[in-house]
């Protein structure tokens, strides 16, 4: 019996590429050229232009300041890679290190707004059968 070759491809150990371009090549592109590489929804969002609040966040990135933002809809651009940002999740700020794999995604995807609830056991009197349980 012959061995079957694995259909899974080996993981590549190399530099990350986005649509065939390395991070350094992406950082050299203008915003319009980078927008052409994005999926249609993100491309359309960038072509419409940034809001005043988003422009302020981008300006803080360029200055190298520590950035805290409520703008969860801002798209991660190549010039942001390697920096840390704090994104509001509705209750507090979540610290996120921006990696090359995050290019083209939005800030809100990395700061979940809902957490899993783990309820404790029911108290005395919570159900009809527990009314007559003697208290210790």
Curated annotation (Swiss-Prot):
GO terms for biological process: ribosomal small subunit assembly; translation. GO terms for molecular function: rRNA binding; structural constituent of ribosome. PROSITE patterns: RIBOSOMAL_S19. The keyword ATP-binding does not apply. Residues 114-136 are annotated as: Disordered. It comes from the Archaea. Keywords: Ribonucleoprotein, Ribosomal protein, RNA-binding, rRNA-binding. It holds the Pfam family Ribosomal_S19. GO terms for cellular component: cytosolic small ribosomal subunit. The keyword Ribonucleoprotein applies. PANTHER family: RIBOSOMAL PROTEIN S19P FAMILY MEMBER, SMALL RIBOSOMAL SUBUNIT PROTEIN US19. Protein S19 forms a complex with S13 that binds strongly to the 16S ribosomal RNA. Belongs to the universal ribosomal protein uS19 family. This is Small ribosomal subunit protein uS19. It comes from Methanosarcina barkeri (strain Fusaro / DSM 804).
